[in-house]
């Protein structure tokens, strides 16, 4: 049992210069990744709609394929990093994502819906590794700095709130008559940049003892009450957010006839809501407890749905999606922090990999359902489904 003096010493442990550098490097990578992902959420759905014409049942398939790729890549990428270390894992997967973005661009030029989706799938594989930025920053950080480190890395995603959608507007017509083809060139550049910048992280690899230690069975770890709360909160928070966010461009542009700039504005502020709270979510967790922050996040997501059901004007979409983003941040950051408490270093890969597999499998299902529910039943029923 840890002695009181040791506990007091742990509480006073200050983040080292290495910890701060890891936060900075991974925050930049998170910002670039979220710029690319925000770009994809906006452009891929509209690209799907352009390719499919009036039949919008499968307009969200590109987003679904990205999320299927992310779900499929969660466990392999976690084990890749266990084997080669965080740095090598991030570099390798960024190259896969870059190839995927280039393939998507080429498929657009050839008007190949299947090829476009395959490229998006490869980008999703990279996304599985990029989701590990939040875990990686906590690997070597002192316990009292973990929540803040995680929230600061997630906060950097606020860059994507504006860079992603603005990049879509600037690049959607640069390659001539094929709308959005140039956007996926930008996606390739964002993705490649993360693989270069991440070289600057300094996270120790597992020791020989940690690597050979298989730890407890996965089922035993995930059946702990803390682990159950962590996985459920992260999964539901992401599924609800993704269901509504994926359908929003269709609802605004196709259903309600709002202009592209209004849709971009709503998505930008949704992303601000998702990531800007990260500058203080860690402090809120340390002050009010992680469970209270998760509960507040769930309440905000419910409020978001209520506002969306009231009306479909631009202000309704704006406030609803903004609250949806804040709610997601509280729930997801809280779930991530809880998950770091249930495993040892040797158990890290399988626990984090399975957690993200569950989360992104749920997201993929929600994404596919979003287009189908919207096509047959409309925007209000998408919101009822979120409830």
PLM regions: where:
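C-terminal ends and interior cores of transmembrane alpha-helices
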Residues: 95-110, 300-312
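Juxtamembrane intracellular "pre-TM" segments in multi-pass secondary transporters
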Residues: 2-20, 202-231
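Cytoplasmic helix-loop-helix junction between adjacent transmembrane helices
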Residues: 117-155
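Short amphipathic helix-loop junctions that connect adjacent transmembrane helices
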Residues: 43-56, 246-266
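Intracellular juxtamembrane helix-capping segments at the cytosolic ends
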Residues: 44, 127-141, 330-344
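Helix-to-loop junctions at the C-terminal end of transmembrane segments
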Residues: 73-86, 276-290, 374
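Hydrophobic core of transmembrane alpha-helices in multi-pass small-molecule transporters
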Residues: 31, 113-128, 316-330
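C-terminal membrane-cytosol helix-exit motif in multi-pass small-molecule transporters
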Residues: 168-169, 188-209
């Amino acid at each position: 049992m840890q002695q009181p003096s040791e506990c007091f010493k742990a509480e006073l442990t200050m983040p080292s210069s290495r910890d701060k550098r890891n936060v900075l490097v991974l925050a930049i990578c998170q910002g670039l990744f979220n710029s690319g992902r925000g770009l994809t959420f906006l452009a891929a759905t509209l690209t799907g709609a352009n390719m499919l014409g009036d039949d919008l049942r499968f307009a969200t398939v590109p987003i679904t394929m990205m999320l299927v790729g992310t779900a499929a890549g969660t466990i392999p990428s976690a084990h890749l990093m266990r084997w080669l270390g965080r740095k090598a894992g991030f570099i390798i997967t960024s190259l896969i994502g870059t190839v995927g973005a280039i393939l998507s661009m080429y498929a657009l030029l050839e008007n190949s819906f299947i090829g476009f989706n395959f490229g998006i799938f490869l980008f999703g594989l990279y996304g599985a590794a990029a989701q590990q930025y939040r875990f990686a920053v906590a690997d070597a950080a002192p316990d009292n700095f973990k929540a803040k480190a995680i929230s600061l890395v997630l906060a950097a995603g606020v860059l994507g709130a504006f860079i992603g959608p603005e990049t879509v507007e600037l690049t959607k017509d640069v390659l001539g008559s094929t709308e959005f083809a140039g956007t996926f060139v930008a996606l390739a550049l964002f993705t490649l940049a993360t693989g270069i910048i991440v070289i600057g992280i300094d996270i120790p690899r597992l020791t020989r003892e940690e690597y050979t230690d298989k730890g407890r069975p996965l089922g035993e770890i995930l059946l702990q009450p803390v682990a159950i709360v962590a996985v459920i909160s992260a999964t539901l928070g992401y599924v609800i957010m993704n269901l509504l966010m994926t359908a929003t461009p269709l609802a605004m542009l196709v259903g309600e006839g709002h202009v592209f700039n209004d849709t971009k504005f709503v998505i930008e502020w949704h992303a601000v809501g998702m990531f800007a709270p990260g500058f203080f979510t860690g402090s809120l967790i340390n002050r009010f407890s992680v469970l209270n922050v998760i509960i507040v996040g769930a309440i905000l997501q419910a409020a978001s749905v209520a506002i969306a059901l009231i009306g479909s004007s631009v202000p309704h979409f704006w406030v609803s999606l903004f609250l949806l983003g804040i709610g997601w941040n509280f729930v997801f950051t809280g779930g991530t922090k809880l998950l770091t408490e249930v495993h040892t270093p040797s158990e890290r890969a399988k626990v984090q990999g399975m957690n993200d597999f569950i989360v992104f499998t749920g997201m993929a299902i929600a994404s596919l359902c979003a287009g189908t529910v919207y096509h047959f039943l409309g925007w209000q029923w998408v919101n009822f489904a979120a409830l």
